[in-house]
């Protein structure tokens, strides 16, 4: 294994808590910053020796509690006491940024009527509802979206990981509750960032399995 936790002969990394070997996308990389404080490297691009931890809140909390960062780096470091919450905020920001970028590119519509119209035209690739959206509006849009997706043999990804305030800030307009993105790279990034945030928050499902991926015909928030 190399100094960054890579298993010899492959791209797998070893979790500093469970010691399990997993692909990088199922882990979070941390590095020591210039001041000696541990820093989440969600994009996996920061220089320096990395410490890899399973991408769940539970694992990050355990890494802090067990001193896994100092042990892996073999040096004294400073670990923020709210590291697990910091990671969650950064993941939510990445999802909001993905929504913002897609919106600026003209690939997102917002508002119940516009989302409903895009679904009807078959142009919606992913729905984004605020976590605090009213259940009736969500249900109406979801039923139509899933029915059309089922008829076409396509997935119906639905994201509910951001609050209305977070969606409004990302899209630069007030009171955003419902949004939809057309297909392409922007929609794919939305789905992947939501999947990552959801897995971090929920960890393992009862029974030991991982949470199902966002890009199935289901609500990522259920």
Regions found by a protein language model. Give the residues of each.
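Arginine/glycine-rich "motif VI" loop of SF2 helicases in the C-terminal RecA-like domain
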Residues: 20, 120, 145-154, 172
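Extended interfacial segments that mediate partner engagement and assembly in macromolecular machines
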Residues: 58-137
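Short active-site oxyanion
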Residues: 49-50, 105-106, 124-126, 152-157, ...
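Short, solvent-exposed amphipathic alpha-helical segments in soluble enzyme
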Residues: 142-147, 195-196
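Helix-rich interaction surfaces within compact, conserved domain-sized segments
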Residues: 158-212
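Charge-patterned, long linear interaction tracts outside catalytic cores
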Residues: 209-222
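N-terminal cysteine/histidine-rich coordination modules
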Residues: 1-67, 71-75
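A solvent-exposed beta-alpha-beta segment
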Residues: 125-126, 133-140, 150-160
């Amino acid at each position: 294994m190399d100094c960054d936790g890579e298993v010899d002969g492959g791209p797998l990394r070893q979790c500093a808590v469970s010691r399990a070997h997993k692909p990088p996308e199922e882990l979070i990389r941390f590095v020591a910053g210039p001041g000696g404080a541990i820093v989440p490297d969600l994009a996996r691009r920061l220089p320096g020796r990395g410490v890899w931890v399973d991408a769940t809140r539970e694992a990050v909390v355990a890494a802090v509690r067990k001193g896994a960062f100092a042990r892996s780096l073999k040096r004294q470091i400073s670990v923020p006491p709210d590291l697990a919450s910091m990671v969650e905020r950064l993941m939510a920001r990445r999802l909001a940024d993905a929504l913002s970028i897609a919106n600026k590119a003209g690939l997102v519509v917002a508002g119940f009527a516009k989302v409903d119209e895009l679904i009807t035209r078959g142009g919606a690739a992913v729905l984004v509802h605020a976590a605090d959206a009213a259940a009736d509006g969500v249900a109406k849009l979801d039923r139509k979206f899933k029915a059309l997706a089922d008829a076409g043999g396509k997935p119906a990804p639905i994201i509910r990981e951001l609050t209305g305030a977070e969606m409004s800030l990302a899209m630069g307009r007030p009171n955003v509750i419902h949004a939809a993105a057309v297909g392409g790279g922007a929609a794919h990034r939305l789905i992947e960032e939501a999947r990552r945030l959801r897995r971090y928050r929920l960890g393992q499902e009862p029974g030991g399995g991982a949470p199902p991926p966002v890009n199935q015909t289901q609500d990522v928030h259920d």
